């Protein structure tokens, strides 16, 4: 995931100042741009010298061959003249005046210089890449510039009644329908572990079916992805911070051969976007085949480092969940990817409108975008039991930022003298099932249970197509209120104080008094 290097090169039509400005708007280090430009300039100088040295080496070999053909004297191990030691100034005429033995010595010096130059070039390439991979995509002009997501995300539009309030939150409702085992899940799987069971398993499967059929009717190809990826491929689709904060690493045998003791690192996927992005790795995509649209289905695994204390109860923020994803490969021309961007968020909106979930669309501020996204819109559903908007969908246009490192090129083959173009890649959540279940539970709660959304009824089993009944009491109703807790604690303290006073009084009393 990187920008085009030519964007940093003024002589190639690039504009480093534009990238520096984009970095500043992202509230990231603009100094990375200067570091990259410096390393790239030195790398290009080094490569130019290496090219000249290789030409000089070929010239040495050619001159030796001509002299041997003419049967000129080889020489008696004469030393190289001082003026010849400066390899950068050597010419064919200079070599012609040397003996064969001298030219061979010059060629050895050239070999040493090439090795030294190659080592320097590799070092500069590494320095340049370190900066390049931490520089974000160029921002779309419509992105709000701010580093405060809570205050400055721009609300683009609202659908449905986002003011209604209801009694219970999803944390209580998953228990009331007996569809969730949290404590036992944590014992088995650790923090945020859970068992989804009973009616909520059916509801989840109904959502998956409805989402896949909706996307299939719009030309998306359903695709069930691998759950883990090789490290070298994951590095091409995920930014560096994700390896520490989001991704789970697994280590397994590197081969199925019993005598092979090697081990290989792999990473569990955080979203089907990652394996689908790599699906056409190292390919040329024909213009007539675009757009290519996939409806990804996968289990997703996320560490959620940094979210300690947030949404610790229930199934809204968990380490493992199912998700249906929109993923599109688009033409880089004629604004096609931005037209597709609007189409994808519209598809997500239609899905949640058909489920009757109120929401608003927000334009995410520049400081909260990941490196790849040029722009991101989130669909945040209204949760009437929690009294808050919560994110269900993220829709991003990554332009050619991902495709470049994956080498997914636009066209059939490179044309002579033409620059290689890369496809644009876009992704958008369709349905993260656990979060959507939470939204349905809060919006469709009644006194007796959860009404089933009209569009999901055909996918639910008999007896659960109209209403999912409450079968357990709400945990919040079982817990004493804060006022009751305070009164209870106060009475305990008063009782303890009375006991201490009485004990003291008894110790000070005389026997006759007793």
Curated annotation (Swiss-Prot):
This is Serine--tRNA ligase, cytoplasmic. The keyword Mitochondrion does not apply. It comes from the Eukaryota. Its EC number is 6.1.1.11. One of its GO terms (biological process) is negative regulation of transcription by RNA polymerase II. One of its GO terms (cellular component) is cytoplasm. The modification N6-acetyllysine is found at residue 323. The modification N-acetylmethionine is found at residue 1. It holds the Pfam family tRNA-synt_2b. Gene3D superfamilies: Bira Bifunctional Protein, Domain 2, Serine-tRNA synthetase, tRNA binding domain. GO terms for molecular function: ATP binding; enzyme binding; molecular adaptor activity; protein homodimerization activity; RNA polymerase II cis-regulatory region sequence-specific DNA binding; selenocysteine-tRNA ligase activity; serine-tRNA ligase activity; tRNA binding. The record marks 429 as: Important for serine binding. Residues 479-501 have a biased composition (Basic and acidic residues). Residues 9-61 are annotated as: Interaction with tRNA.
């Amino acid at each position: 995931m990187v920008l085009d290097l030519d964007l940093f090169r003024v002589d190639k039509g690039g504009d480093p100042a534009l990238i520096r400005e984009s970095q500043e708007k992202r509230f990231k280090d603009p100094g990375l741009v200067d570091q990259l430009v410096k390393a790239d300039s030195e790398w290009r100088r080094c490569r130019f010298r290496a090219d000249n040295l290789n030409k000089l080496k070929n010239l040495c070999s050619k001159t030796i061959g001509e002299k041997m053909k003419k049967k000129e004297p080889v020489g008696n191990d004469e030393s190289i003249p001082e003026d010849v030691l400066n390899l950068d100034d050597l010419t064919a005429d200079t070599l012609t005046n040397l003996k064969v033995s001298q030219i061979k010595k010059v060629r050895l010096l050239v070999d040493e210089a090439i090795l030294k130059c190659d080592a320097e070039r590799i070092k500069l390439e590494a320095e340049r890449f370190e900066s390049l991979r931490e520089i974000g995509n160029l921002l779309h002009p419509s992105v709000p510039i701010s580093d405060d997501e809570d205050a400055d995300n721009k609300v683009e539009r609202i659908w449905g009644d986002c003011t209604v309030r209801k009694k219970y939150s999803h944390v209580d409702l998953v228990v009331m329908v007996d569809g969730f085992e949290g404590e036992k899940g944590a014992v088995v799987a650790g923090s945020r572990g859970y068992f989804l069971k009973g009616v909520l398993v059916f509801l989840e499967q109904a959502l998956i079916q409805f989402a896949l059929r909706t996307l299939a009717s719009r030309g998306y190809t359903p695709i069930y992805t691998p759950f883990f990826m090789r490290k070298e491929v994951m590095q091409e689709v995920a930014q560096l911070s994700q390896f520490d904060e989001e991704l789970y690493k697994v280590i397994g045998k590197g081969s199925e051969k019993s005598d092979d003791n090697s081990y290989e690192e792999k990473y569990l996927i955080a979203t089907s976007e990652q394996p689908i992005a790599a699906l056409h790795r190292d390919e040329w995509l024909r213009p007539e085949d675009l757009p290519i649209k996939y409806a990804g289905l996968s289990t997703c695994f996320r560490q959620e480092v940094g979210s300690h204390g947030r949404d610790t109860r229930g199934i809204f923020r968990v380490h493992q969940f199912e998700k249906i994803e929109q993923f599109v490969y688009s033409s880089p021309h004629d604004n096609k990817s931005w037209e597709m961007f609007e189409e994808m968020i519209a598809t997500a909106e239609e899905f949640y409108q058909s489920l009757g979930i109120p929401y608003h669309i927000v334009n995410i501020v520049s400081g909260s975008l990941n490196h790849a996204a040029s722009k991101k819109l989130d669909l945040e559903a209204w949760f009437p039991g929690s009294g808050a908007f919560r994110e269900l969908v993220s829709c991003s246009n990554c332009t050619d930022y991902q495709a470049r490192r994956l080498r997914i090129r636009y066209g059939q083959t490179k044309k002579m003298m033409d620059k290689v173009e890369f496809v644009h890649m876009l992704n958008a959540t369709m349905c993260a099932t656990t979060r959507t279940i939470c939204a349905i539970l809060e919006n469709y709660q009644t006194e007796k249970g959860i009404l089933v959304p009209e569009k999901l009824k055909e996918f639910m089993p008999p007896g659960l197509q109209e209403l999912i009944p409450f079968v357990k009491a709400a945990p919040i109703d079982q817990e004493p209120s804060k006022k009751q807790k305070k009164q209870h604690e106060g009475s305990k303290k008063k009782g303890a104080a009375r006991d201490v006073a009485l004990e003291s009084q008894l110790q000070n009393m005389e026997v006759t008094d007793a």
